[in-house]
Design a protein with these regions (language model features):
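Generic N-terminal amphipathic, Lys/Arg-enriched alpha-helix
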Residues: 1-27, 300-301
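A short N-terminal beta->alpha junction/helix N-cap motif
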Residues: 3, 24-32, 59-60, 305, ...
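Charge-dense, low-complexity intrinsically disordered segments
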Residues: 6, 62, 119, 209, ...
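Alpha/beta enzyme core
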Residues: 10-21, 34-59, 66-86, 95-230, ...
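Short catalytic-loop micro-motif centered on adjacent basic/acidic residues
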Residues: 26-30, 91-92, 114, 231-233, ...
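An acidic- and aromatic-residue-enriched active-site/binding cleft used to recognize and process polar
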Residues: 148, 236, 281
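Short catalytic/ligand-gating loop segments at beta-alpha or beta-beta junctions
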Residues: 233-239
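C-terminal alpha-helical cap/extension of soluble enzyme domains
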Residues: 249, 260-336
Length: 336
C-alpha cells in the first residue's frame, strides 16, 4: 500500500473548491509516456497552474502500474527541479470501470479515481460508486462519479450514442454515493470525431464544419440542483485544425475530424465546471510533430530527434489550454 501523500501528490478537493470560487477549470491531461508527462509538468510549472495527470486503464497497462507510480513521484520532483516549490499535482484514474481497478490504483498511490458506472442501470451505478467512495475516503482519495453517457471512442471507452445527464437524478446520486465530483454529459464526446458531418453546418467564410453548441441548459440545471458541487467535462478536446492539417499534409488521413470549440470550453470553465479533460488534442499535437519530422528528415532514426519536437509541440498546446481556455494560470495555492 502506497499513499499518494508519500509521493508528494494532492487530491482534488481543495483545488476544485478554489476553481469554482475563482471561475476557472483545472486541466486534466491524459498521458501515456514520458514525453507527455514532461510536457504537462513543464507547462504547468511555467504557467503556475495546478494540474491533473490523468491515466486511463489502458494507459496504466501500457506504462506498467509500478513504473507509473515512480513516474508520478518523479513528476513532483521534476516540478520542484524546474523551480516550483509547492506543485499541486493530482494522479487520477480516468474511466475506472470496476471496484478492483479503482482499489488497485488507490493502493498504488493515485490521489483521485473515477468510477464510471454510467453504462449501468441507475441503482447499480449508485451502488458501485458508493463502494469505491467508501474505500477511497479511508485514504483521503477523492472520487469522480458519472451520470449520462458520452458518445465516441477513446482508449477502451466507447458508446454509439450519447445520453444527456438527467438533472433530476443528481441530488440523489451525490447524496447517496458521497462522490466528490460529478462528470456530466452535455454534448461533448470522446475522440477526434466528436460530431458527425450531418450534425454540423459549414462556415461559408472558411468552408470548415462548425459543430452544434453544447447543451448548457443541462449544466445550469445540475448547478441549480447541486450549487457549488464540482462538475467535470469529459471529451473536451478542440481538435486543432492546424494539427489535423499537418497530419494530413504528411501522410495522415483524418477526414472530418472536429472537436469542441474553445469558446464553449471557456464558458464552461467560468462555472462550476472545474475539471476539463483533454486527451485527443495531445495525441494530435504529438502525431503532427512526429509526422512532420519523419517527412522533413527521412534519414533520422534517433527517437530523441522526433520525440523531442513532439514533446515541445505538446507543451505549447498545454500552455495554450491553461492560459487561453481554462484560465488556471497563476492559480497555485502558494505562488513562489
Amino acid at each position: 500500500m502506497v499513499n499518494y501523500k508519500d509521493l508528494g501528490l494532492v487530491n482534488t478537493r481543495e483545488m476544485f473548491a478554489k476553481a469554482i470560487k475563482g471561475g476557472y477549470a483545472i486541466p486534466a491531461f491524459n498521458f501515456n509516456n514520458m514525453e507527455q508527462m514532461q510536457a504537462i509538468i513543464k507547462a504547468a510549472v511555467e504557467t503556475k497552474s495546478p494540474v491533473i495527470l490523468q491515466v486511463s486503464k489502458g494507459a496504466r497497462q501500457y506504462a506498467n502500474a509500478t513504473l507509473l507510480r515512480y513516474m508520478a513521484q518523479g513528476a513532483v520532483e521534476y516540478a520542484k527541479e524546474l523551480g516550483c516549490k509547492h506543485p499541486e499535482i493530482v494522479l487520477h484514474l480516468d474511466h475506472g470501470d470496476t471496484f478492483e481497478t479503482c482499489k488497485s490504483c488507490i493502493d498504488s498511490g493515485f490521489s483521485s479515481v473515477m468510477i464510471d458506472g454510467s453504462h449501468l442501470p441507475y441503482e447499480e451505478n449508485v451502488a458501485l460508486t458508493k463502494k469505491v467512495v467508501d474505500y477511497a475516503h479511508q485514504f483521503d482519495v477523492t472520487v469522480e462519479g458519472e451520470l449520462g453517457v458520452l458518445a465516441g471512442v477513446e482508449d477502451e471507452v466507447s458508446a454509439e450514442h450519447h445520453t444527456y445527464t438527467n438533472p433530476e437524478e443528481v441530488i440523489d446520486f451525490a447524496t447517496r454515493t458521497g462522490c466528490d465530483s460529478l462528470a456530466i454529459s452535455i454534448g461533448t464526446s470522446h475522440g477526434a470525431y466528436k460530431f458527425k458531418p450531418e450534425q454540423c453546418h459549414v462556415d461559408p467564410a472558411t468552408g470548415r464544419l462548425v459543430p452544434p453548441p453544447l447543451e448548457f441548459a443541462v449544466r445550469d440545471a445540475v448547478m441549480e440542483k447541486l450549487p457549488g458541487f464540482p462538475i467535470v467535462l469529459h471529451g473536451s478536446s478542440s481538435v486543432p485544425q492546424e494539427e489535423v492539417d499537418t497530419i494530413n499534409k504528411y501522410g495522415g488521413k483524418l477526414e472530418a475530424a472536429i472537436g469542441i470549440p474553445e469558446e464553449q470550453l471557456r464558458k464552461a470553465a467560468k462555472s462550476a465546471v472545474c475539471k476539463i479533460n483533454i486527451d485527443s488534442d495531445s495525441r494530435l499535437a504529438m502525431t503532427a510533430a512526429i509526422r512532420k519530422t519523419f517527412a522533413e528528415k527521412p534519414a533520422e532514426f534517433d527517437p530523441r530527434k522526433y520525440l523531442g519536437p513532439a514533446r515541445d509541440n505538446m507543451e505549447k498546446l498545454y500552455k495554450h489550454k491553461i492560459i487561453n481556455v481554462l484560465g488556471s494560470e497563476n492559480k497555485l495555492a502558494q505562488l513562489d
